[in-house]
Amino acid sequence: MAFLDNGNHTAVTEFILLGLTDDPFLRIVLFSIILCIYLVTVFGNLSTILLIRVSSQLHHPMYFFLSHLATVDLGISSSVTPSMLVNFLAERSTISYLGCGIQLSSAALFGTLECFLLAVMAYDRFMAICNPLLYSTKLSTRFCIQLVVGSYIGAFLNDSCYILSFAFFLFCGPNKVDHFFCDLSPMMELSCSDASVSGVVISFTAGSITMTTLIVIVISYFYILITILKMRSTEGRQKAFSTCTSHLTAVTLYYGTIIFIYVMPKSTYSRDQNKVVSLFYMVVIPMLNPLIYSLRNNEIKGALKKQFYRKTLL
């Protein structure tokens, strides 16, 4: 639709991303920093996926979900970071209509998947701590696969709202996107067609998913906390807390940023603040998650040592 003419107006076929800054020196500095972050993100998440796959002691539901979370983190970061790095070095930061749609769609898809997987992982911790005797029975391989497949289906359904909305937007005027990627809000501002209905639908679906998954997480940890407080063994409490700390940290970072970006009224913060928080959410958090889940996890550290030891003997 972006390639059709609208009366006397020529439809926009490419967009200019204004990015984070116009300063040439800052662009080089940001390029260097974000490139390092992206390389650590790719290495950390790929290492997590491969370690879980090759280590038999990590073939449990918790690590099955963690491997999918690492895949999603790779997807979130890769949906925007490579093009952002290229734009830092380009004189004119442009993106095609199709490229913009793909970027918007992939960011929405992986962002939704992260919400679902964090909720699934909270349920996994609830079953492991509150119902340990039923854990292996309830979270069978088949059920774990069903939870992950359901997460992907839910994410694709939500993503279809973004795809359809973007497809029906008509861009015939300004083509400067005041962001470092094609986020929905600045794209709606550029649309010549009425985007109010699309905005309401997407706000409802995205808000419903955010709140529903957050409620699942809160309820799960409410029962986990009650169970931990009832434990008589100090060692048992510490072990239970340690298994939840990593996940709670990841949840706090992720939901804190998306609530700031998509739930808080836009009048309470500036566009530049939105860019910084979006950068943290899409670039920094995917790098931090492998570190968060590995530094406090003795099973992952043990599996990593075992693999290194095995390599040195070969």
From Swiss-Prot:
Q: Which Pfam families does this one have?
A: 7tm_4
Q: Name one GO biological process term.
A: G protein-coupled receptor signaling pathway
Provide the alphabetized UniProt keywords.
Answer: Cell membrane, Disulfide bond, G-protein coupled receptor, Glycoprotein, Membrane, Olfaction, Receptor, Sensory transduction, Transducer, Transmembrane, Transmembrane helix
Q: From which domain of life does this come? A: Eukaryota
> InterPro entries in the record, alphabetically?
GPCR_Rhodpsn, GPCR_Rhodpsn_7TM, Olfact_rcpt
SUPFAM superfamilies per the record? Family A G protein-coupled receptor-like
The cellular location(s) given in this protein's UniProt record come to: Cell membrane
Annotated TM spans = 29-49, 58-78, 103-123, 137-157, 200-220, 241-261, 275-295
Membrane topology category: Multi-pass membrane protein
Disulfide bond positions: C100-C192
GO MF term list: G protein-coupled receptor activity; olfactory receptor activity
Spell out which residues lie on the membrane's Extracellular side. Answer: 1-28, 79-102, 158-199, 262-274
Family in the record: Belongs to the G-protein coupled receptor 1 family.
How is this protein named in the record?
A: Olfactory receptor 5P64
| Gene that this polypeptide is encoded by | Or5p64
